[in-house]
Amino acid sequence: KNHRLAGEVNLFNIENDRQAMIGYRISAAYQNMGFVTEALRRVIRFCFEETGIQRLEAEVMTVNVASNRVMEKCGFTCEGTKRQAKFVNIYTDFNIYGLLRSDIMGEHAAST
């Protein structure tokens, strides 16, 4: 409504083997309104429908309950936890999430 930037979704570490990392952040004023879920779903659709990306991966702090919930709502699978993976004031655990083209587009999409 107000045409202000509320947040962003980023793709990075895009690899030749058709994998990429995905991440996002949103201003505190716009949290818990569904904007991240909506934006992430659109970027996921774009990645799998318009590019050759086969797999998206994300790392989410285990203590960030809302962000872990967004991952699950968008169809990502928690594939494990990296213990004390990064220093964020203290050493922090991160859940690793993966999403395959076939998870969104169907099994036949894995070979395209």
Regions found by a protein language model. Give the residues of each.
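Acyl-donor (CoA/ACP) binding surface of acyl/acetyltransferases
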Residues: 1-112
